[in-house]
Curated annotation (Swiss-Prot):
Binds 1 zinc ion per subunit. This is NAD-dependent protein deacylase. One of its GO terms (molecular function) is protein-malonyllysine demalonylase activity. It is found in: Cytoplasm.
Length: 233
């Protein structure tokens, strides 16, 4: 049986109410991106960065998975090991929708990482203050998020799985961080879902849905069915 990859970005979780860098309101407007999302910013002002991620956890607690998260969870249940679910998002909405084995390329917001023993543990939506590592009891902790200027270990997993993928599906990502057009060209067939037209990106894909993922996801599910039957989308 052939393998499918769904790679998602901010456009997957935006309908749930999670703000992105491109929004003009909400959490992000108060911050300079490089101050709170870069290794340099963390070295300069760790408290500001940790406070920022505390605020993001609070925001995450107050939103729910949307229909697209739930549909992807159903697709994963149906296709199992033949469907790779990869996301640039750091939220837990796919997991809350019941999706198993999600690969988070840029880390996971509910988790902290110990700077002493490198242990990773889940604190849900709580603040980092007064937390300690369950392994070594250290309080020298940070968010388990890959910031700008840091290595993303999960990229190795992404590229390994891409080499096994026949149908590549890109959902809600502009290609600004990852070259999804190049990924599409590595696979037999490809589907793109974006909210606004982008001719430079569209040219790499076989099928394109320029619409909200809530409207597109059921069509994409049908495309997967067709691909698994006869290799076409």
């Amino acid at each position: 049986m052939k393998n499918i990859m769904i790679l998602s970005g901010a456009g997957l979780s935006a309908p749930s109410g999670l703000k992105t860098f491109r929004d003009n309101d909400g959490l992000w407007e108060e911050y300079d991106v490089m101050e709170v999302c870069s290794a340099t910013g963390f070295r300069k002002n760790p408290k500001k960065v940790l406070d920022f991620y505390d605020a993001r956890r609070v925001q995450l607690q107050n939103v729910k998975p949307n229909h697209a998260h739930e549909k992807i969870a159903q697709l994963k249940e149906k296709w199992g090991k033949n469907l790779f679910v990869i996301t640039q998002n750091v939220d837990d909405l796919l997991e809350r929708a019941g999706c198993k084995d999600v690969v988070h390329l840029h880390g996971f917001l509910p988790e902290l990482r110990c700077l002493k023993c490198e242990g990773i543990f889940n604190i849900g939506y709580e603040k980092i203050i007064d937390k300690q590592c369950p392994k070594c009891k250290s309080k020298d902790l940070r968010h388990n998020i890959v910031m700008f200027e840091e290595q993303a270990p999960a990229y190795a997993t992404l590229y390994s799985l891409l080499n096994q993928t026949s149908l590549f599906i890109s959902i809600g990502t502009s290609g600004a961080v990852l070259p999804v057009g190049r990924y599409a060209s590595m696979c037999e067939k490809s589907i793109l879902n974006i909210y606004e037209k982008d001719a430079n990106l569209e040219r790499y894909f076989d099928k394109i849905y320029i619409e909200d993922i809530i409207n597109a996801i059921d069509k994409i599910a049908l495309d997967i069915e067709n691909f698994m039957k006869d290799g076409n989308v």
